[in-house]
């Protein structure tokens, strides 16, 4: 249902808060809306006189501040579980997204807990960039009266494992904070470590934090991070959906194989918004499983135990273990286990282990350094299979019970043997139309269209980074939003790699897309990228920014996102008449105001 908002002057909510409230309630029935209204009214009135009290009692309560700094949802889930544990222990706790945290109040925190994931080359999640920058700036206050604990989430397949958590932990201590507990760095399989850490945090805080009344506990619970996204389908309990369309959208001679994938959600009622991601559980290639099994002189029928169930080895490898991403830990453990003459020299050398893992898939490590393993030893080396996240390329305002994604199939060769990405090749090659795909929605409130439909939008998305902007334009078209829209897109070749070309041309013709700037890096001698187009259009870009435009960036975190940010800083400095430091501060303010949002990976 659609509700006409009252004039902003009458609202106690800012436009972004109002947009989140409207998004949270858009699919509720009248009965559900009435229940929600009564629920909030009841919480507000659990104590006599609360109704007339001034707002924001949570901020004034003494107690624990719990900051969630999440990129893919894992840190958020850990933080929410800890919040529930603390509330169950009748402790006063406020849970807040790092992006919503007023970081200048950190000097007033007495008990602070941070749950932080890491992305890219050791960088914090997008929602925590401003907080980290503040803590590492000259403006950071002394924290002599603050006690803190940090839980870091990461992936040992990356060089800068849990770096964001390490950075928060070291800086909070450097500023004078007292560690409640030593930092925990958790790998992809983080659940057991998180459960143990949560129990320790609760025990420590029981002796430090004030107890909360029932009313305070209820009010504190409203500080949860986006609990409004309720669905019976989750990462742990995904929806079994049906693959409807698998269409190659790059040309015959393109070096890239990019697929437009449409998945039918049926009558599941699964809802998403532009900016959200689709989680996809995949199965490994049976041929890869067979190759690995044969390389260690096994048959695949050997029994192994996975999550308490006994399965044949081949089935376990296909459904439950990560086979396409190697890590330094796997290399080191395999070298130690097999006493491999070629791998043992790498043990203890972090840089060499990391390089070997990044350039040598597990199957080729087994081929180059062969050894006979029993089934339990093999699975003991491996990490659990985890779902892949894809930026959603559709809006339900247009596609209703479907969800679309844009998938770049990962393909390469090692010594003449074809290798492929686990999830991308599953979607591109191994799922037939109407075949089953297990999916869930990973909501991302840090990548949202402006609440005001008149606000201009600047979208920067080379390669498959174009995906969420297709969703944005579908939504803006359906809403008949009057705000201007400007797209920057790039890829190697115009004739082979112009993803969704006909759709963008239609949006331009219809006036939905006000401007489009294209960068083809291989169509001329000099390579041209989207960041070059940003500089080229600097004066007009600055005019849009001055008119209140929101800037969105999607795609590669390691190179593109950094190059684009540098170009934006140069444009701001040149056309805004600022020095480098002032331009950096200006862009940081845009981020805090949610006018500069990134979905990078």
Curated annotation (Swiss-Prot):
Classification via InterPro entries: CysJ, CysJ-like_FAD-binding, CysJ_Proteobact, FAD-bd_FR_type, Flavdoxin-like, Flavodoxin/NO_synth, Flavoprot_Pyr_Nucl_cyt_Rdtase, Flavoprotein-like_sf
Binding annotation for FMN: 70-75, 117-120, 153-162
Co-factor binding comment: Binds 1 FAD per subunit. Binds 1 FMN per subunit.
CDD domains xref list: SiR (cd06199)
Catalytic activity of the protein: hydrogen sulfide + 3 NADP(+) + 3 H2O = sulfite + 3 NADPH + 4 H(+)
The enzyme's E.C. designation: 1.8.1.2
Pathway stated in the Swiss-Prot or TrEMBL entry: Sulfur metabolism; hydrogen sulfide biosynthesis; hydrogen sulfide from sulfite (NADPH route): step 1/1
UniProt xrefs under PROSITE patterns: FAD_FR, FLAVODOXIN_LIKE
FAD-binding FR-type domain boundaries: 236-450
Protein family per UniProt: Belongs to the NADPH-dependent sulphite reductase flavoprotein subunit CysJ family. In the N-terminal section; belongs to the flavodoxin family.
Protein name: Sulfite reductase [NADPH] flavoprotein alpha-component
The organism of origin for this protein: Citrobacter koseri (strain ATCC BAA-895 / CDC 4225-83 / SGSC4696)
Recorded name of the encoding gene: cysJ
